[in-house]
């Protein structure tokens, strides 16, 4: 039975884990790291780079290096948060054909789900390399406060990557699952999850293998990227004040600032001050300019203090929805790389009135929880029951544009709820059901998930027809809605797809593109391996020829030299088959050289057998043979 992997698809970094027996293992990638940058780059030669290789070349290729794309998943292009993001990144955010926010690299448009799929593909490869077998099933985590459109887009990303997504699980819930599995005693816990791009807080109760989410809250556009942006702005402002040049206008300089800001932020978690030194950051008529600046922890904290305070309001709301006070929280778990910042730890400690638990790795615990959930779904882990909730209220638009809730936020999922509505006009033959998600009282202020029409309603005065609307939320938090006319039993049902979202044909095309990319990547890998083998073989044979000298017959030597020349010619091209063929010919020639050297060695040995050193003739002509003598202990021979 194939393994189910757990993937933490992060804004900044991603992580993959697997449950093996009673242990959950985080899998190292090909570079030996336990987390992989959620970055995808497209080089000028058309090659796609994912992870660390993409990050390494970001400074020289900023316009085609895509990062933090998770923040765009399931969002419309005209979303205010997208407009804000456009000013912060060096790559292009464009409008997709469906009105969603897409990205552009090397002149080609990509859906955020596609970019996420490339990262998931890297996680899949990492797991397959470790397991030595194909992987087709996964549990993928999302921020708890992701809406339906964002969850659906994440599931689409898994499908594009060639994965069957068995479950979409909330990140804080996954962390609690990993934590709860090792915790013997029950209790009420708070998970404070501040990652690269999103913030979530969940209140959970753990008791006898049951992990129940009581409430969740958060902000899907608040994370480490925003902290970096504050540092970037500070550096750019300081440089402009000193040199009169705005570095924000230079994409290459902006990418260097981004890397320096992230590095400084990390360093200031363990030191009080750091120096940012960026030589040749730009130039003007007077010559090159360098950025050299000291940044203290106190200055960083003052730059981001309001961002840290923004996380406190969701914490208050989560406690209120769970009907518990901060004093009733038994333990606080910190998740996400940003929770390493001392100021964040201090703020959490102050809010909850207790020291946060330090026995979990904030970068890995979510992936571990996802792997545990995968094992639960496979039946490998028993006696664990996970009860999650829907983060936002669901309802429809009714007369006057009012948002009428059918399912309140923090309702345990899966769940199903029905409510009966009627028509607003006499003889109304059809109704349009508009489905919204959010907490505002007017429908227009909430997120429109989708709409559909129920037609063929029997003519009747307003208020008479009975139209039953049913909401069904599955364990992934994905919504289906149906409407039925009770008089005619006519029913219309839709699985909610974002008002933009990817169509089935879009997804199928992207799956094919991903498969084509995988084939191309395999071909590139084969070519690289063939090149390496050919170069190594050519060098080896040249060395053998030089060492052998005249021991090799002229015909064999000429054949080997011709084979080496053929390999060198093939190395100039990019035909793996031609390289392999030339290498095979050279390999045969190498064998002949080896045989010739061996025969020459044997002949020398045979000739040397009768030489003076091997024996001598005595004075009377008799043969005297050299012999080795060994002293023997008399006692032993007695």
Curated annotation (Swiss-Prot):
The modification Phosphothreonine is found at residue 198. Residues 607-618 have a biased composition (Gly residues). Acts as a chaperone. It comes from the Bacteria. Induction: By stress conditions e.g. heat shock. InterPro entries: ATPase_NBD, Chaperone_DnaK, Heat_shock_70_CS, HSP70_C_sf, HSP70_peptide-bd_sf, Hsp_70_fam. This is Chaperone protein DnaK. GO terms for molecular function: ATP binding; ATP-dependent protein folding chaperone; unfolded protein binding. Pfam families: HSP70. Belongs to the heat shock protein 70 family. Residues 604-638 are annotated as: Disordered. It comes from Gluconacetobacter diazotrophicus (strain ATCC 49037 / DSM 5601 / CCUG 37298 / CIP 103539 / LMG 7603 / PAl5). Keywords: ATP-binding, Chaperone, Nucleotide-binding, Phosphoprotein, Stress response.
